[in-house]
Amino acid sequence: MLSYFKELSLNRTAWLLLAFVAFALEASAIYFQYGMGLVPCVMCVYERLAIFGLLIAGLVGAISPRFFLTRWLALLLWGFSAFKGLALAIKHHDYQANPSPWNQCEFKPEFPQTMPFDQWFPSIFAPGPVNCSEKQWEMFGLGMPEWLILAFSIFALMFVIVLLSQFKRAKPQYRSVFR
């Protein structure tokens, strides 16, 4: 099984699939904001940034998946984005499951001064005046943070499997002059 995932990680199509799934999640977030009129909170903006990290990881991995450094850079970005996004989604769910005055998110995103994403791309990363503990949308009884917990858990699980497969030896390629 690990050899299958090792071969998959050496294939450009798998990395483009990761980028496509992340792009689809970003596109659905934009649809929720502009199509359905749901205003994103600060945690939603952070979760969007984690999904954007997954998109970048897929594109970096698709550049040259057989090159060791490119593949490992993409894997590190994938792992960081998946686990950070999972932690953010769990915290967002905690805000909604246990609302209280002392357990609230910030009003303004706290990006580093060198990368103010909310100023560079305000149409995507600028939050609206909404509290993170408000449930704005549900599907099958699950809110947006619960669906993101599921999505980031799948991303994290796949990352762990692909990471473990990197330590699997590749099949030796016997080359013969007389073949």
Swiss-Prot record:
It is found in: Cell inner membrane. One of its GO terms (biological process) is protein folding. It is a multi-pass membrane protein. Residues 1-14, 66-72, 166-179 are cytoplasmic. GO terms for molecular function: electron transfer activity; protein-disulfide reductase activity. The chain crosses the membrane at residues 15-31, 50-65, 73-90, 147-165. HAMAP family: DsbB. Required for disulfide bond formation in some periplasmic proteins. Acts by oxidizing the DsbA protein. Keywords: Cell inner membrane, Cell membrane, Chaperone, Disulfide bond, Electron transport, Membrane, Oxidoreductase, Redox-active center, Transmembrane, Transmembrane helix, Transport. Belongs to the DsbB family. This is Disulfide bond formation protein B. Disulfide bonds join C41-C44, C105-C132. Residues 32-49, 91-146 are periplasmic. It holds the Pfam family DsbB. GO terms for cellular component: plasma membrane.
